[in-house]
Regions:
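Glycine-rich helix-loop-beta junction characteristic of Rossmann-like nucleotide cofactor-binding loops
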Residues: 1-2, 105
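Conserved N-terminal Rossmann-fold NAD(P) cofactor-binding segment
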Residues: 3-5, 26, 30-76, 81-90, ...
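Phosphate-coordination loops involved in phosphoryl transfer and adenosine-cofactor binding
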Residues: 4-7, 109
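Glycine-rich Rossmann-fold phosphate-binding loop(s) that bind the pyrophosphate
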Residues: 13-14
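N-terminal Rossmann-fold NAD(P) dinucleotide-binding loop
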Residues: 17-18
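Rossmann-like NAD(P)(H) cofactor-binding subdomain of soluble oxidoreductases
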Residues: 85-147
Length: 147
């Protein structure tokens, strides 16, 4: 499999997601970024706030949007949303909302990577079970899951 022919979707364009999006795009991948923050989207689309290490790579294939439907074009989805802590427990509300929004656009044979910080076992416990229930997708048969 030649991965550079694959399209990558990155959900969450903050401190982790934006640099990852720029780096993947600078290496030749087509990258679609999703965020609900207009400023983050504008920074990507106007090529402002590019990490200094990636200056000069402004002409890469990278677009950002709030619209999850553009994820229909991607083969790899990386989730980089915050999981702030409350009472020493991660708040998974944002991750759960993303999974709800994402479920209709995850294709068979996709790779889903959860980059967000979650407790050990949470990816398997929540994400795997959610996709089985909502889509009937079985991990390692219908899609691949990494964390």
């Amino acid at each position: 499999m030649i991965y550079k022919e694959k399209n990558i979707g990155i959900i969450g364009l903050g401190y982790v997601g934006a640099p990852l999006a720029y780096l993947a795009a600078s290496k030749g991948y087509n990258v679609i970024g999703i965020d609900n923050d207009d400023t983050a989207i504008e920074n990507i689309n106007k090529r402002t706030n590019i990490p200094k290490e990636l200056k000069g790579f402004e002409n890469f294939k990278l677009v950002a949007s709030k619209d999850y439907t553009i994820l229909q074009k991607v083969d790899i989805i990386i989730v980089c949303v915050p999981t702030p802590t409350k009472n020493n427990k991660p708040d998974l509300t944002i991750l759960k909302n993303v999974m709800q929004d994402l479920k209709d656009f995850l294709k068979r044979d996709s790779l889903l990577i959860i980059e967000s910080t979650v407790a050990p076992g949470m990816t398997k416990q929540y994400v795997k079970d959610f996709l089985l229930k909502e889509k009937g997708f079985i991990v390692n048969e219908d899609y691949n899951l990494a964390y």
